[in-house]
């Protein structure tokens, strides 16, 4: 009787098997989390560029609008006059100054109208088409604003220094206030050009 022995085989219950299942499924879950974490910084990077794009467009509106207003309000009349002449300087005396006002006003309006597109890029940072459109339009505005600022800068230079070869005297000694406003407008316009170029670079990096 004492020599007899009984062998009992214990099998795993379904509950015990279920208890081990999460341990086996844990690695795929963690790998999925890694994939999500790898994609998140990319979208955040583009979203940050889009936010900076909006800020630069607001700055460009301020500089372009300031340039147009400063040039458009240029008007100075000298305190002395003759029987036949009154010495007065206005921006519309020169076609280049008129073009300058129109070009900067167009640029300011364009930057305001493209802010909604930049907001779309903030909401959906992975979109490519809006950024390509902004690159094209910003390049056109760079050409327009540079042409206006460059043409006006040459005239302002002559107004300050004159040209002895062409017998053109400097007039800024007489029209000091007008020349200061015009010079400030040219500086603001070139700042707008810099802003537009930065916008192009930002859009290119975000593609």
UniProtKB/Swiss-Prot annotation:
Region (Disordered): 1-20
Keyword Lipoprotein: no
GO BP annotations listed: cell wall organization
Disulfide bonds: none
Compartment(s): Cell membrane
Pfam families xref list: CASP_dom
Family that this chain belongs to: Belongs to the Casparian strip membrane proteins (CASP) family.
Name of the protein described by the UniProt record: Casparian strip membrane protein 1
């Amino acid at each position: 009787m004492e020599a007899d022995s009984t062998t009992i085989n214990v099998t795993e219950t379904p509950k015990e098997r279920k208890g081990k299942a999460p341990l086996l499924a844990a690695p795929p879950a963690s790998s999925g989390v890694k994939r999500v974490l790898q994609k998140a910084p990319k979208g955040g990077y583009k979203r940050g560029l889009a936010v900076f794009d909006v800020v630069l467009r607001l700055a460009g509106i301020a500089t372009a609008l300031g340039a147009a207003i400063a040039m458009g309000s240029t008007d100075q009349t000298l305190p002395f006059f003759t029987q036949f002449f009154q010495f007065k300087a206005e921006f519309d005396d020169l076609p280049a100054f008129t073009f300058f006002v129109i070009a900067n006003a167009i640029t300011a309006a364009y930057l305001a109208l493209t802010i909604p597109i930049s907001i779309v890029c903030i909401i959906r940072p992975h979109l490519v088409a809006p950024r390509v459109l902004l690159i094209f339009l910003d390049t056109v505005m760079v050409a327009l604003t540079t042409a206006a600022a460059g043409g006006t800068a040459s005239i302002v230079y002559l107004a300050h220094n004159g040209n002895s070869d062409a017998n053109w005297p400097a007039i800024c000694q007489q029209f000091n206030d007008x020349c200061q406003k015009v010079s400030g407008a040219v500086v603001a316009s070139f700042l707008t050009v810099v802003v537009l170029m930065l916008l192009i670079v930002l859009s290119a990096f975000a593609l």
